[in-house]
Amino acid sequence: MKDLKDRTVLLTGAPGGIGPHLASRLHAEGVSLVLSGRNQAELERLATTLPPARFIVADLSSEEEVEQLATAAGPIDILIANAALPASGELVTFSVEEIDRALNVNLRSAIVLADLLLPGMLSRGTGHIVLMSSIQGKMPTALVSVYNATKFGLRGFGLALGLELRNSGVGVSVINPTFVRDAGMWAETGVAPHPLAGQVTPDQVAAAVVRAIKENRPEIDVAPLGTRLAATMPRLVGSMARRIGATAFPPAAVARQVAKR
């Protein structure tokens, strides 16, 4: 999809984290935005800065509201499944409800939206699905086992769906950012990541999304070179990390994310 002008884009998780950066970059490409999130006031504020964007309030932890969102959005050319929860902490500290909520928001909603919007894309012979995963969808880390599960699942779904849709005119891209500074769930903790992980900016992530769509890239890791190389050999890196004691998500960050589960 070389030209995004006048394409209709559904962006979930629009008002928070890197959402506004994604929306702004896409708006600059001339797309028509459909913004979704839980906070109506924040959605309305964002939409007014990106005319003629419209917004739909939806809680993606609700199975019913996910389906309602797909219907209300209307024909969509590009789906960007960006909504996510931190889901940090030891597994034994999670309630069943918290696990379900993380799975619904981070994984199930993206799969269901793709399922419901894909027939229209196929009938038009064009479209794109972008799944915002994480470098933690390739490299497991202690204290984020539930989050890892959702991102590993999202990445696997996206890569497999891309194979299913080969030569259909509809592309699928998985975006794997490392820790994002200045915006998003990591930046909100105020904790510095391990130097091996590195950091990127929201604008770098937004640029990767646009590039993935235009070039029909199956997967892009948005991370410093060393982190990208490490992600290609997770078993070796995991062994090295255990030796130097760098296997766990920073406990201080976990403590600040628990309330958002």
Residue ranges and their predicted role:
Residues 15-16:
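Conserved glycine-rich cofactor-binding loop
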Residues 57-68, 96:
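The beta1-alpha1 cofactor-binding region of Rossmann-like NAD(H)/NADP(H)-dependent oxidoreductases
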Residues 90-91, 98-103:
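Substrate-binding pocket helix/loop in short-chain dehydrogenase/reductase
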Residues 114, 150:
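Active-site helix of classical SDR
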Residues 134:
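Residue(s) in the substrate-gating loop at a strand-loop-helix junction
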Residues 174, 194-231:
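C-terminal helical subdomain
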